[in-house]
């Protein structure tokens, strides 16, 4: 079974747009349900930078006069998909991140989002000092001019979109410190089960009688025991023209594959070539240990001459004895020749081997064979084998490195082009 993160990665950008739907139901508290399948265009009255009129409204701080001044929250397709992917990556653990955007009239516009390094459990997420340091560094280096932090988001894996007591307290502190501020909650498990994104946007209110009476009409079972402390905003989605053209384009890049049959075959060939090099080097080491390097063709010739001097008296003695035996047995030999005029092949070979000239020929043949096959010939042949094995090894290695480099380039391009 695929994990939620793996299932999300298989979707194209156009298919991910279909996930930007609200959950169905009549008790939507004024939620919008825009169609994102292309038959009905998205609401696109917004841009990625605030207007001058919006900046004037921010300076007036009208939300301080009306606790429920903000009634709408607009999320860009980019921010929404990044939030959803972060929640999917977290799995059963809660995740947390920050929202970037601006204020337009009574609507908080969320243009982008980014993750925070936090400690999360199944029911709680804690931001440590490292998270605040990361937030400051991110604002100084990666946030475009005109955008600011307009809220935070976290996930509720499997138990709906609402604010707990700790969530409401955190939102109240942030609203008092850096208002306008928005809290977004997303449920990745329900989003995957229903096929539409389950998300909610909330703001807290001062604890007054009027707000308590208004919030008492909400469903406490849905929004929790602290539903009187906050209210929900309408959520809509928008796309900037650049995002729409990119989603409608026919750009298609397949994710790079980590390994295939070709790579496995090349790895096997590389191991075989390495073993061949090792075996040739081992044979060279054994041969040098058995035959000293000082033995060469001249040393072999001297050794053969010494053997020849020791063998010659013995060979002459054997020939003289054969001559004496032939003089006493000549009659018997003549009789045998009359019976069998043709000598046998064995007798001819025996006479040839017993002759002194044959002895000299054999000695010369043994000396010449020793001269033609010195120890250096084996070294040269083993050196040729080693060079061939090393050449094959380095060729396969370079081809494999080239293949991995191309795979890295594809992975880098895919990450730069499609990472949200």
Curated annotation (Swiss-Prot):
Protease among keywords: yes
Alphabetized UniProt keyword annotations: Cytoplasm, Hydrolase, Metal-binding, Metalloprotease, Nucleus, Protease, Signalosome, Zinc
Superkingdom: Eukaryota
EC category name: hydrolase
Residue ranges of the motif JAMM motif: 154-167
One Gene Ontology biological process: proteolysis
GO cellular component: a single term: cytoplasm
Keyword Cell division: no
InterPro entries named among the record's database cross-references: JAMM/MPN+_dom (IPR000555), JAMM_MPN+_peptidase_M67A (IPR050242), MPN (IPR037518)
Subcellular location: Cytoplasm; Nucleus
Positions with a binding annotation for Zn(2+): 154, 156, 167
Role noted for this protein: Catalytic component of the COP9 signalosome (CSN) complex that acts as an regulator of the ubiquitin (Ubl) conjugation pathway by mediating the deneddylation of the cullin subunit of SCF-type E3 ubiquitin-protein ligase complexes. The CSN complex is involved in the regulation of the mating pheromone response.
Family listed: Belongs to the peptidase M67A family. CSN5 subfamily.
Entry comment, domain topic: The JAMM motif is essential for the protease activity of the CSN complex resulting in deneddylation of cullins. It constitutes the catalytic center of the complex.
Subunit relationships: Component of the COP9 signalosome (CSN) complex.
PANTHER family assigned to the protein according to its UniProt record, in alphabetical order: EUKARYOTIC TRANSLATION INITIATION FACTOR 3 -RELATED
Name of the protein in its database record: COP9 signalosome complex subunit 5
The gene coding this protein: RRI1
